């Protein structure tokens, strides 16, 4: 399928075998950029994205956190926007989705305690479906037990969790991403261009101009 569009006077062509149906797992205090940017980007290229949170419904919101790099030894944290969910968690049937997106921030810390969430992550990996995780999203991958023998990027503070889960931590720049089979990972939001470009490639979406 080809969707032409004009941007800055240039004709862009977005090619994909078909529009994909994607699931995004979010929770309270997910990172602001890492939630909204992939959500809007994937919608913009023609995919369907269902953003869900355990025990919440479409129209409910999650609070987000803004993580920034301001010269301290770790990231700073501020209150972000409210992000509105567009699908009921209870209605999620993983077999009907083509890919999974996991933002970082605080949310993965508690989402990994929910066996329903871990089962969703395992389904996508066992089915070989594309999974995109950024920053602390790797905590869900580790808790789901899907990193054995895999190479995974994450926020550097998550490197011990990646290794303890049997994975190899990809030591890449904060603006870079890494693809290992169906798994596309990155250290933080500065990597969004590389991370989303690699995820779109794994999904089979091409943008030409």
State where each predicted segment sits.
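Extended, subdomain-level signal for the structured scaffold at the beginning of enzyme domains
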Residues: 9-127, 140-151, 159-209
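Short, thiol/selenol-centered motifs that function as redox-active sites or metal-ligating centers
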Residues: 134-137
């Amino acid at each position: 399928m080809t969707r032409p569009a004009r941007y800055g006077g240039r004709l862009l062509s977005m090619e994909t075998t078909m529009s994909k149906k994607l699931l995004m797992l979010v929770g309270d205090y997910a990172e602001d950029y890492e939630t909204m940017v992939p959500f809007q980007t994937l919608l913009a290229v023609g995919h369907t994205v269902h953003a869900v949170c355990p025990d919440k419904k479409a129209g409910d919101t999650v609070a987000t956190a803004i993580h920034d790099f301001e010269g301290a030894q770790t990231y700073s944290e501020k209150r972000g926007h409210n992000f509105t969910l567009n699908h009921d968690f209870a209605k999620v049937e993983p077999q009907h989705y083509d890919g999974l997106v996991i933002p970082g921030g605080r949310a993965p810390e508690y989402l990994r305690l929910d066996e329903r969430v871990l089962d969703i992550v395992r389904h996508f990996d066992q089915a070989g479906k594309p999974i995109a995780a950024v920053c602390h999203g790797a905590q869900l991958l580790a808790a789901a037990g899907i990193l054995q023998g895999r190479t995974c990027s994450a926020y550097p503070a998550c490197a011990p969790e990646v290794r303890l889960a049997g994975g190899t931590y990809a030591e890449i720049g904060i603006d870079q991403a890494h693809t290992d089979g169906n798994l596309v990972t990155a250290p933080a939001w500065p990597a969004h261009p590389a991370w989303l470009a690699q995820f779109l490639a794994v999904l089979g979406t091409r943008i030409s101009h």
